[in-house]
C-alpha cells in the first residue's frame, strides 16, 4: 500500500488502557507522569478511564468498558487519525475473554504507525522523548489512494 504522512500536533491524543491486573501499575505511572499528561488530550477504555480520572483528577474521555467494545472504539479512533499514542498495560500472563479485541487494537495501532507502550519501561522511554512535546510527521497508509485504485 502507498504511504502518506499525517501530522501529530504537539499536544498528542493519548489512549490509556490497562487489563484488570495492570490497572494499579497504570495508575502509578499516570500519577508519576500527571504533569506531562495534563498537556495532552486523554482517552481511555471505560473502567480504566473512570478509575484514572477519579484518582488523579485528570480530564479523560472514557469509552465503554474494554470487554464491552471500548478497545474497538479506541481502534476506530486510531484508524480515523484521532489517537496519536497508545499506552496499553496488558497482562501477557492472563487470558481475557476479549483477547481478539486486544489483538485487534494492537494490530490497528501498528497498521496506522502510532507509538505503543505496553509496560512501565516502554511508557517511560516514550514519554521521555522530546517528540511527545513537538509536532511530528508520521507515515501512514494512504487509504485515499487505495480507494482511488479500486475504482
Swiss-Prot record:
The keyword Lyase applies. Its EC number is 4.2.3.3. NCBIfam families: MGSA (TIGR00160), PRK05234.1 (NF003559). Residues 1-151 form the MGS-like domain. CDD domains: MGS (cd01422). This is Methylglyoxal synthase. Belongs to the methylglyoxal synthase family. InterPro entries: Methylgl_synth, Methylglyoxal_synth_AS, MGS-like_dom, MGS-like_dom_sf. The active site is at 71 (proton donor/acceptor). HAMAP family: Methylglyoxal_synth (MF_00549). Transmembrane segments: none annotated. The lineage of its organism: Bacteria, Pseudomonadati, Pseudomonadota, Gammaproteobacteria, Vibrionales. Keywords: Lyase.
